[in-house]
Curated annotation (Swiss-Prot):
It is an enzyme of class 3 (hydrolase). The chain crosses the membrane at residues 3-23, 47-67, 90-110, 120-140, 148-168, 186-206, 217-237, 249-269. The gene is uppP. Its EC number is 3.6.1.27. The lineage of its organism: Bacteria, Bacillati, Cyanobacteriota, Cyanophyceae, Acaryochloridales. Keywords: Antibiotic resistance, Cell inner membrane, Cell membrane, Cell shape, Cell wall biogenesis/degradation, Hydrolase, Membrane, Peptidoglycan synthesis, Transmembrane, Transmembrane helix. This is Undecaprenyl-diphosphatase. The keyword Hydrolase applies. It is found in: Cell inner membrane. Bacitracin is thought to be involved in the inhibition of peptidoglycan synthesis by sequestering undecaprenyl diphosphate, thereby reducing the pool of lipid carrier available. It comes from the Bacteria. It is a multi-pass membrane protein. It catalyses: di-trans,octa-cis-undecaprenyl diphosphate + H2O = di-trans,octa-cis-undecaprenyl phosphate + phosphate + H(+). One of its GO terms (biological process) is cell wall organization. Belongs to the UppP family.
Length: 273
């Protein structure tokens, strides 16, 4: 039984890590993957929370130099009253952009709204594909880090708010918003990741109690977290490299195919609410 749990932990961590930071929705894949394999026990729900730790550690580790530079540069800007400094504008953009998702997430939690339904996942998979396609088609892709300001942070943060709907994808919604605002692809992806750090970290801390309550399954939870951390790091590195030379159309078509397949499965009764 232990070996089976450990294997499940590795697989779930792989799915979480490879989909959390790609614009294809980790929540959708984890929910559907668990549903198809019959992994819907309390342990698996706890594992989903634990794996967020792995993703947070990965993104913090990958962007540690960026974070250090933003904090240091912002402190220097504060001392010199240099409000046009790049790091200061980035910090303000990230701070303001974090507010919409946190506010919406708090409201959903207080209202105890359940959104993890196959119909919502399938709909959002296709809807976000359309939005990402429009952003890819019409975005100018000329703006860089130097051009990012508070308004950009707020608007991309509103995109992050959409990711509260399963199937939308935090990476997909923020990437679409950033591209629509004219940011070049690598800059859009990098800003998307940096903007997600506060939200992911806070959400993970909120879920921490559920993880630590599951003390009897500590080893599988640690394995799932480590697996998620490794594959999250690899996914971040791969996506940033990929977007240096390619568009997001491969993800757009993937989402359309995924959403269509899900609706087919729902129609056939393979996926239940």
């Amino acid at each position: 039984m232990d070996i089976i749990l450990w294997l499940q932990a590795v697989i779930l961590g792989l799915v979480q890590g490879m989909t959390e930071f790609l614009p294809i929705s980790s929540t959708a894949h984890l929910i559907l993957f668990s549903d198809l394999l019959g992994w819907k026990s309390i342990w698996h729900k706890t594992a989903l929370d634990a794996m967020q730790f792995g993703s947070v550690i990965a993104v913090l580790g990958y962007f540690w130099q960026d974070i250090h530079q933003i904090v240091q540069g912002s402190w220097q800007a504060w001392q010199r009253r240099d409000w046009q400094r790049e790091e200061w504008k980035l910090l303000l953009g990230i701070t303001v952009g974090t507010i919409p998702a946190l506010a919406a997430g708090l409201l959903l939690k207080l209202a105890k709204v359940e959104l993890d339904r196959p119909q919502i996942i399938a709909t959002m998979a296709i809807a976000m594909a359309i939005l990402l396609g429009l952003a890819e088609q019409w975005g100018s892709r000329k703006r860089t880090y130097q051009d990012i300001g508070i308004l950009d942070g707020f608007l991309v943060g509103c995109g992050q708010m959409i990711a509260l709907l399963p199937g939308a994808s935090r990476s997909g919604s923020t990437l679409a918003a950033a591209l629509a605002l004219g940011l070049e692809r690598p800059t859009a992806a990098r800003f998307s990741f940096l903007l997600g750090i506060p939200t992911l970290t806070i959400a993970t801390l909120v879920q921490a109690k559920d993880v630590f309550d599951e003390g009897t399954l500590l080893i599988p939870l640690v394995i799932a977290t480590l697996s998620s951390m490794v594959f999250s790091y690899l996914a971040i590195a791969w996506l940033l490299q990929f977007l240096q030379r390619h568009s997001t159309w491969v993800f757009i078509w993937y989402r359309i195919g995924l959403g269509s397949a899900l609706w087919g499965a729902i129609a056939l009764g393979s996926l239940q609410s």
